[in-house]
């Protein structure tokens, strides 16, 4: 009986250990499950009960989806389960893609056929940018090769019938509930809670309903014509027109006219009490009429305009302009999220939004480096004076008096423990300001509870979230829909690559065989030290060294990523390269990065997970990954983004950037690697598997002898379980440093003999090494 209990305990430990290794760093701590109120329709799924399934599990839609006579000219298949398939080779692909990005979530976008999925949140986003229920169903019917299933029509109506019909608008610093549907306003006013929120005059009577005519015209003027995606009126030549059904072509002509024309809408509104806004929002959600927040910044006379404009040199690319038109489509500022690939110019989108609103702006990033980069971006693209920009980080606390643009980090605002006197004064100032725009960089990294704390500390009329990867390994990404707003725009990575807006990257997975000694220990050890064994695999080290030598001879700029600090230091020191990790000071970080950018002698740097986001290194064109965080899809995409910026002078080659992921064969790392690649594969990237690096035997590389490999193994075995853990970045949300944890240890650890290894060295060799000056210090420029 005792033996069985022991086996059960070992199984539980193994499962727990596996869970901890796979776990994502963005997860909230236990007990943070409090959810924002969401409409019940948001939980609905498309009904698939009538779909036939054959003996192999394949779905048979032939009876439900008869083809139209001219189906070859139409680009869409709409399946009864909500999945939509788009032919990328269709002459009307541009039109159909613009529409699908607005109403559905991209699932997979390879070369020829793209897959999308209708969800409640994607339909909410469609309504928020002005599409009506009838528009969505009519567009789908005209684009589809078959009839649109009745279940899909019902699902669209269910999700869009009430969303977007009621708006919360701030005008002249007074809040109004506004709708173009008078019957909806009357329905809301019948509710006692909403009647209580309505503003009353001095006599205690409710204020009158206000009827006005609202002219909607985009606040972003079209400056780019016919250049790949800014308008639906481009991209179809005369020959292709003959292949398009007449009803489809006429419909698109009408779409273009509707987009260009000013639209007059009659609205009905009533004023509400400012102190009851939160209660009003919750009640409207319960009534299935969630409020859509809009900021009428042009008519906000109480908040002063700031002196900021785009410089004449700032030219928006078509996709950047398109994303901003979604945000400012009706002359007001909508809150929401814009998704653009790393290196595609998210910062310029944020700066342009601030220049359009022209009210006080708060920018939040996730590190002190990103704060410095945002300041540089504002000075590069806008006419803002340096004295108008205020930074608030642990290292830099500028005086906020008279500033118009404040830049800080999430951890600085979400900090709950005692602050210094100076920091407390700045926080008080941030809290008392009424911000016109809040820009939230890398918005996917913020857990819901932390986010809610940041949102309650500062008040902003409009919130713009920017990210490259709207994915998380938990389900908390949907919280952003109601904490910030719907997704306004998402770009196609492959399309931007083909148009030259981002680099063309060759992705490769390099398989490194485990040396016999290392693999023997890997199989025997059951603690977290296994991670250290497959990361410090001598063959992986040799592959990394070979790739660095190969690309340095080509004058490439190389970044090597390692999540494990022990491995990071070992690799960097052995290869004589500079490295950046958590404890590296801000000054030293900037010095290393500046040398990497401008010093021709520094072509390789090692970075821990602190460099996953917000490190702006446009010169880098080679990335080597030696260790990573489990199966995180987000981290893989963020790291690829470090080399995605468009490269100058490298157009002749087929590929002008390289992404290598080094994986130890026959270990857990291979399973993690497959999981990590899912997001990039869905974006259209393919990974080349390299089992042998040509020319590696001819190079002089480290750990080429059994003795050297044995010494490395002894060093790894002498390391603690703490060394095997990943770096915990200060201020990173989701870090579990505050929780109790259990680690396996030995008696030698308790006696202080943890790092002791018996090794012999020749005395004369030691004396010679003391006189040697490290060449790295000669190469660095101060």
Curated annotation (Swiss-Prot):
Residues 1-52 are annotated as: Disordered. It is found in: Nucleus. It is an enzyme of class 5 (isomerase). A motif (DEVH box) lies at residues 442-445. SMART domains: DEXDc, HELICc. Phosphorylation on Ser-751 by CK2 controls the 5'-excision activity of ERCC1-XPF endonuclease; phosphorylated protein inhibits the excision activity and thus NER. Dephosphorylation reactivates the 5'-excision step. Phosphorylation has no effect on transcription or the 3'-5' helicase activity. GO terms for biological process: apoptotic process; DNA repair; DNA topological change; embryonic organ development; hair cell differentiation; nucleotide-excision repair; positive regulation of apoptotic process; protein localization. GO terms for molecular function: 3'-5' DNA helicase activity; ATP binding; ATP hydrolysis activity; DNA binding; promoter-specific chromatin binding. CDD domains: DEXHc_XPB (cd18029), SF2_C_XPB (cd18789). Belongs to the helicase family. RAD25/XPB subfamily. NCBIfam families: rad25 (TIGR00603). This is General transcription and DNA repair factor IIH helicase/translocase subunit XPB. It comes from Rattus norvegicus (Rat). The lineage of its organism: Eukaryota, Metazoa, Chordata, Craniata, Vertebrata. The gene is Ercc3.
